[in-house]
Each structure stands twice: as C-alpha cells, then as structure tokens.
C-alpha cells in the first residue's frame, strides 16, 4: 500500500495515499479500533454543511482568503453530495467531544480543497485543516452544532413525513370502518361494544399527539452552539460569526436555525436532544401499542381473534406449511424497544457532562439518529406492507359481538347493576345467551331485551 507523510503536533505519520484524511484521522483509526459503529452519514453531511457555511462567512468577514474559502465550499459540496463516503471511517467510540471526527472533516476538506486549487495532499497542501477549515471554531462547538443540524433535518425530513403518511392511512381505515360494530376489550377481557372505526381513531389520535410533541421539540434543536468555540466564550471567533453561520445553515437547509442564546449551556449539556428523543420515545411507545393491537386483532386464522386480516407478505415458518405471521407488527415492536433503549443511553449521556463540556456527544447523536432512522423506516414499511391492507372480517366480528356477555351493560340503567350481573353470570355458567338468561330469571321481557340491548346503539351512548 502506497502512503504519504502527514504531520500534526505529535509529528509525522504515514497515511494511505489514496485517502484524503490526514494525521489525526489516522491516529484515531489506530487508537479507536472499537466495534463496527461509524459516525452516522447524516452527521457527516451536517458537519460538511457547517464547514461550508463557516468558510463562506469567514470570507465575508475578511477572516479567510476568498479563493481558499471557495475551494473549501466546493470540497464540502462534494461531501454533502456523497462523493467521498469512504473518507469518514472513524468509530463512534472515540473522544467524547467528537474532536477526531471534526478533524477528520477538516483534513478531508483541506486536502480536497488543495487539490481543487491545483495543489497536493499532505504537507505541501495549500489549505490548512486548522487555520483555514476550522477557523473561528473548536470541536467543542462544531460537533454539537452538527448534532443539532443532523437531528433537526432528519426529524423534519424523515420522521414527520413518515408519521403523516401512516396517520393518513389509518385515518382512511377509521372512516371506512366506522359503522362496523365490534366488541371492545379491557384487561384483555370482553368489554362493551365500539366500532372498528372508533378503535382505529384512537391510533390516529396517538399519532397526532406524537406529531405535536415532536414538533414542539424542534425549537430547541434549531439553537446552534457554533461561535462558542472552546468553552462558550467565543474566543478566536469573529463577533458576528455565530449569527451569520446559523443564518447560512438555515438558508441552506430550510430549517429555522439560530444562534443559541447561551453558548455555555450549548457546549456543556444536551437538553434539546434529550427532550426531542423523549418525544421520539413516546412515538415508539404509541407504535408498539398500535402494532400489538393489530397483530392481536389479526390473530388466527382459526383459533385467534381474527377480527381483521392483514397482508400475507411471506411464508412464516420453516416447518409449518401455510403459516403466515404478522411480521411487520413484529418489526415495529422490536424497533420500538430499541428506541426505548436508546433513550436510556441518551439520558445517561446527557446527564454526564462535567463543567464546560459534555463528553458523551458521539453516543448521544449515534443513538438519536439510529432512533430517527428506525422510526421513519419502520413507519414507512408498516404503512405500505401492513396498515394499507387491513380489512375487517365482518362475520367473525359479528359472531364475537353476539357471544359477548358484556352487552348486558346496556341493561344497567333499566334493571340495575346487580340484576344485570346475575344475567351475565347465569349465561356464562349455563352456556346460555344473554337473552335466554334474562328471560329465565324474569328480570325483563323479550320485547324489553330487544329494545334495550342493541350493540350499535351502545357505541354512541351518551356522546
């Protein structure tokens, strides 16, 4: 393997010739060969967007030669476009400030910008990773800025559209099934009737609440740490740098980014990400509930509830011929569990900052972005391959309604709770219908039973 010599303050080190990274990235590869988790692609893109904005603003403020700034911006555009995916190989499990990943970006952009200016990589390059690409910045403010940019963009462009689409599918099902009377269930036991549409409307409302909660967290994610530099004082950054870079990122992404009002907090803690992930966890809890309900309602086909049918997507067993399983529901419940686990890790990371810097940043953003991707992809998959194909099994629904003892609840206002309970117990013990038990006990007439026990009427009682 051909190499070239790169240098940092620790001295020279050999770097693979074909790669754009430099000395600090190479040292990180050596000292942090830990597991397989790499810095998330959305974070890399966010860091490139930040470096592009910083170069542009530094040039406007007279802090950077315009030609150098232009080359850095062009190099950053290539990274944003996904041209150099193999140049960002560092593990999540590195320094807690993300310094190595900040320098990875600085080195790649410096070497590539040098090439764009007709120069070379390495010692003779025309663009310096620290003096030019990182000008007016510290890893301590760039990394948390990239965290917020990546988190906000991914939530806005992945999670919310997927949530909206699934919500629309379920709302359409709720409207289509609104007149189908079915038996309700509480404590996994029979309860009074409702309609299938009413039941699904509860799922729609859960998703509406989740969307409201997620949107409420975006204002915090839009506040950026850039300009705080090392400890929040803004040392070595132009006084206008923070506001201008934030405005440039807002223009670039379409998100409402602004300079954080207190840079000390922005470097030392991550409440905005904890708050936002809490909303994602709430969405995960709702999705787990919905998916569990769907697979219970579709259980069978002959020995379960069987009130609905869901798409049959693939064989379900390697030994039982013809078996089909609710696999989309299972995938959603698993990913929801992972998001809940991620929330614990993010909470620990967010609570573990000391003095002027939180040093769990890679952990926090790795888990956050994994949750975003899981939820977004999971909702798209569940919507397309399960929810869109939900259909009612009307005969089975009617059968279960007619067999339910809890229809007796409609008699409470007419004969009282105690007599109604006697009817239900007699029917259950002697395997009678409610009507047969009621007439045998003499608590009401056949005409009264027909008038008072109407499942459809019970779904709209006292509304």
From Swiss-Prot:
Its EC number is 4.2.1.2. It is found in: Cytoplasm. The active site is at 187 (proton donor/acceptor), 317. Residues 121-142 are annotated as: Disordered. Keywords: Cytoplasm, Lyase, Tricarboxylic acid cycle. PROSITE patterns: FUMARATE_LYASES. It holds the Pfam family FumaraseC_C. Residues 121-134 have a biased composition (Basic and acidic residues). Pathway: Carbohydrate metabolism; tricarboxylic acid cycle; (S)-malate from fumarate: step 1/1. Gene3D superfamilies: Fumarase/aspartase (C-terminal domain), Fumarase/aspartase (Central domain), Fumarase/aspartase (N-terminal domain). GO terms for molecular function: fumarate hydratase activity. The record marks 330 as: Important for catalytic activity. GO terms for cellular component: cytoplasm. It comes from the Bacteria. It is an enzyme of class 4 (lyase). Substrate binds at residues 97-99, 125, 128-131, 138-140, 186, 318, 323-325. One of its GO terms (biological process) is fumarate metabolic process. Involved in the TCA cycle. Catalyzes the stereospecific interconversion of fumarate to L-malate. There are 2 substrate-binding sites: the catalytic A site, and the non-catalytic B site that may play a role in the transfer of substrate or product between the active site and the solvent. Alternatively, the B site may bind allosteric effectors. Belongs to the class-II fumarase/aspartase family. Fumarase subfamily. Homotetramer. This is Fumarate hydratase class II. It comes from Bordetella pertussis (strain Tohama I / ATCC BAA-589 / NCTC 13251).
């Amino acid at each position: 393997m051909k190499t070239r010599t790169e240098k940092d303050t620790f001295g020279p080190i050999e770097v693979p010739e074909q790669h754009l990274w430099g000395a600090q990235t190479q040292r990180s590869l050596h000292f942090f060969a830990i597991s397989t988790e790499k810095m998330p692609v959305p974070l890399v893109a966010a860091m490139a967007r930040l470096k592009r904005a910083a170069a542009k603003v530094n040039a406007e403020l007279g802090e950077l030669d315009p030609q150098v700034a232009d080359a850095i911006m062009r190099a950053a555009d290539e990274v944003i476009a996904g041209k150099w995916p193999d140049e960002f190989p560092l593990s999540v499990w590195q320094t807690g400030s993300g310094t190595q990943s900040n320098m990875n970006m600085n080195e790649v952009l410096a070497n590539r910008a040098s090439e764009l200016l007709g120069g070379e990589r390495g010692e003779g390059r025309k663009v310096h990773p620290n003096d030019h690409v990182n000008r007016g910045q510290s890893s301590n403010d760039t990394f948390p800025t990239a965290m917020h940019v990546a988190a906000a963009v991914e939530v806005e462009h992945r999670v919310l559209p997927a949530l909206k689409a699934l919500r629309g599918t379920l709302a359409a099902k709720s409207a289509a099934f609104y007149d189908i009377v079915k038996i309700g269930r509480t404590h996994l036991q029979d309860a009074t009737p409702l309609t299938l549409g009413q039941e699904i409307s509860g799922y729609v409302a859960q998703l509406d609440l989740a969307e409201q909660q997620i949107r409420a967290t975006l204002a915090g994610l839009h506040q950026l740490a850039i300009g705080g530099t090392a400890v929040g004082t803004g040392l070595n950054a132009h006084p206008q740098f923070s506001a201008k870079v934030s405005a440039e990122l807002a223009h670039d992404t379409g998100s409402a980014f602004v300079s954080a009002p207190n840079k000390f907090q922005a470097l030392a803690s991550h409440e905005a990400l904890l708050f936002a992930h809490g909303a994602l966890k709430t969405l995960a809890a709702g999705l787990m509930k919905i998916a569990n309900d769907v697979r219970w309602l579709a259980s069978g086909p002959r020995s379960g509830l069987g009130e609905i049918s869901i798409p049959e997507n693939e064989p379900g067993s390697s030994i039982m011929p013809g078996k089909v399983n609710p696999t989309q529901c299972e995938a959603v419940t698993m990913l929801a569990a992972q998001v809940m686990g991620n929330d614990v890790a993010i909470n620990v990371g967010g609570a573990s900052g000391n003095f002027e810097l939180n040093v769990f940043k890679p952990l926090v953003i790795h888990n956050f972005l994994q949750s975003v991707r899981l939820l977004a992809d999971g909702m798209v998959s569940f919507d397309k391959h399960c929810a869109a194909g939900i259909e009612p099994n009307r005969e089975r629904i009617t059968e279960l309604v007619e067999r339910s003892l809890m229809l007796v609840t409609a008699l409470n206002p007419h004969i009282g709770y105690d007599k109604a309970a006697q009817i239900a117990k007699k029917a259950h013990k002697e395997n009678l219908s409610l009507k047969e038990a009621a007439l045998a006990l003499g608590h009401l007439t056949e005409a009264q039973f027909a008038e008072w026990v109407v499942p459809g009427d019970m779904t709209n009682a006292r509304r």
